[in-house]
Amino acid sequence: VTDHYQNTSKLRPTLKLYRADYRDEQAMTRILEAYDTPAPFQLSPIDPETSRTSSISGVIHFAAYKAVGESIRSPLKYYSNNVGGLINFCSLLGDFGIKNFVFSSSATVYGTVADMGVALREEHCSQNLTVFVDEDGKKQMVQPGCSGLTNPYGRTKWMCEAILNDLAHADPEWTITALRYFNPIGCDESGHLGEDPRDAATNLMPVVLRVISGALPVLNIYGDDYDTPDGTAVRDYIHVTDLARGHLAALKSRADRGFRVYNLGSGRGQSVLELVAAMEEVSQRKIPTQIVGRREGDVGMCVAKATRAEIELAWRTEKSLETCCRDVWRFLERVGNGTLSNA
């Protein structure tokens, strides 16, 4: 482990890191003030704050709680941070003239709509009246709304999207992109950066790694009675590197101001058992599993249709499920088996 972290220290990113809660207005103000730039002229003699500009060209928002089960147990915690925090933070960014914003949304907003058995389009859950042409070439009109939300976490993401949509309508200087993640897995191909949550792992891949490493005895599979080919839940797994490229594409794409939503997924659905089999193939280790009951808030299928991102952001996934598994296995080999948390 020591060698692992000594190696990572040589890979120095050109980043300046600040430790602060984004809900702490004083702390965030101090950070943003460090990037103030002189305005060429004062835009408003009445309100000098409107002349404020910043060397920060854009902000990516990752500051949300994200566990479905925890959101069901502690909804106010999620509404306070995810929704309340976003409102105050965007207000502060506006004061500093920072109005290019990328928001981490989630495929969770589709809720039970995901169980229709078709790849999900952004129009299946829309903030605005939308007209599109479906797969049969027919023009469809979709009213604003999102039915079937199954948990407070998903509702916070939907509420945040609505707030950001309203903000972009009210102030046309804002460029706001909401990225609906499907199921991120994998890690950097170097094996130096990987996922080992300090708290109890809630995502599938970190739990799989803990079982392989011996930190956990067995992998619980939540339900084998879904309407899917093998009965286990089907998800659209996307490599974190592809996800990162999607954020960069969103930051660079400023041709049209306003609010826009994109799915970030591969368009390929794979089951829990298929992921386990892929990880067993890569690691050449057997992963013990047991079937337990479904979890509250889960759906059977959730797969993206990512055509909009392909066309408008020139983005698509490049890495397969097998690549994801190889990369996380490389990380586990670097840190050493048995060193992962057993939370």
Segments (PLM) and residue ranges:
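C-terminal substrate-binding subdomain of Rossmann-fold SDR/epimerase-dehydratase oxidoreductases
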Residues: R23, M205-V207, I212-A343
